[in-house]
Amino acid sequence: MKLRSKAAALLLLALAALLLALLSLRAGRAEPPALPARPASAPQRHPAPVPARWPGPGALPGASPGVRRRRPPRPRPRAGRRGAARLEKLARRPGEPRSFQAVLPPELWIHLAVVACGNRLEETLVMLKSAVLFSHRKIQFHIFTEDSLKPEFDKQLRQWPDSYTKKFEHRIYPITFSVGNPQEWKKLFKPCAAQRLFLPVILKDVDSLLYVDTDVLFLRPVDDIWKLLRLFNSTQLAAMAPEHEIPKIGWYSRFARHPFYGSAGVNSGVMLMNLTRIRSTQFKNSMIPTGLAWEDMLYPLYQKYKNAITWGDQDLLNIIFYFNPECLYVFPCQWNYRPDHCMYGSNCREAEHEGVSVLHGNRGVYHDDKQPTFRALYEAIRDFPFQDNLFQSMYYPLQLKFLETVHTLCGRIPQVFLKQIEKTMKRAYEKHVIIHVGPNQMH
């Protein structure tokens, strides 16, 4: 009995010790006890001086140094913010990083204009396709065409996948000429080409515009050429590339019978315009001593030089900027790369260093065998299925096609054509991997 009572006593002592240990552990986690009050006679201790710091984000105006204020509670996100974020998520393509594109106001969109008549439907659609493949910002397409082509443009553009149609809106306009004889304008150089001269008059609500010919292809985001608008000084209102890099073998310097810009003229196949400035400028001219508004100048200018011009509206633009050189910004040839830049030997240094940014397949080179390098690029973009992998379905087949063009002068420099498109595809691929796989899972 004594042994049992001793065992019971020891068990009770052990339980009591365990209970005390638990209580002390719980008390240790609580706030420390307050310090005893300092006697009134005790000397005041001044804290060591603290280096001055900028007030933190929680500091309040008028707070004394050393006094820390509690940060105000974070406001709950408004429903509008959540709605905007939801819209942005819906508007992003798979693999596209978060940006303000989805909620970008319409006045900040890129505006792209093209004039298409006759058999230019397919060429125009391929150009528009190249624009949406790589662009980041939303684009407003302004398509000027004949009545017979309007239904087909609408039909084809609406058949594109949703992930691409959400990147643009399009509007189709009739061919119209506000001054002079419409039939004369329509027959100037190529069918409907003179329409571009009237864009500042027709698109009165558009501030800035990128005009391109139907035979143009974008090999990098349209956003990049749009940024050149920021480089305009206070007098510049349009931008174009030189017609030729070597004036002594250029067309204008050898054959032109009218004034032209600079030493070699400019090519109007890719033209960036500040329409607001164009509409508000009085242009110097050879007809009257005072300036003329853009619309008032066009028909008298055509009447004066119509027997001397060869390249139609491009010649008229050269004449305008001959008398108003301060109004033109000249961008490098990589933004308007044509067969002339390689068929006589490479003569576009910017493209050699940076690669072709905008390809201009003039003289019908997309549809014949004279320049197979240009044709290979056109067919690669035309035949690319929207939802396929860019590297597998466009870039690698393009490299194989380029192997068949090495016997041509343009085909001997494939890196000039591939540099920008490869860089653009890599950027798109890296964004896709980082967004969908995550940076910590890439190794």
Swiss-Prot record:
Low complexity composition-biased segments: 32-45, 55-66
Single biological process term from Gene Ontology: O-glycan processing
Gene Ontology CC entries for this record: plasma membrane
Lumenal compartment segments: 26-443
Residue ranges, annotated region (Disordered): 32-84
Cytoplasmic side: 1-4
GO molecular function, one term: UDP-D-xylose:beta-D-glucoside alpha-1,3-D-xylosyltransferase activity
UniProt key word Membrane: yes
Catalyzed chemical reaction(s): 3-O-(beta-D-glucosyl)-L-seryl-[EGF-like domain protein] + UDP-alpha-D-xylose = 3-O-[alpha-D-xylosyl-(1->3)-beta-D-glucosyl]-L-seryl-[EGF-like domain protein] + UDP + H(+)
Primary location recorded for the protein, binned into one broad class: membrane
Keyword Transmembrane helix (UniProt): yes
E.C. number(s) listed in UniProt: 2.4.2.42
Entry's localization field: Membrane
Top-level taxon of origin: Eukaryota
Residues bearing glycans: N233, N274
Basic residues composition bias: residue spans: 67-84
Family: Belongs to the glycosyltransferase 8 family.
PANTHER family linked to this entry: GLUCOSIDE XYLOSYLTRANSFERASE 2, IP22168P
Function: Glycosyltransferase which elongates the O-linked glucose attached to EGF-like repeats in the extracellular domain of Notch proteins by catalyzing the addition of xylose.
Name the record gives this protein: Glucoside xylosyltransferase 2
Annotated organism of origin: Homo sapiens (Human)
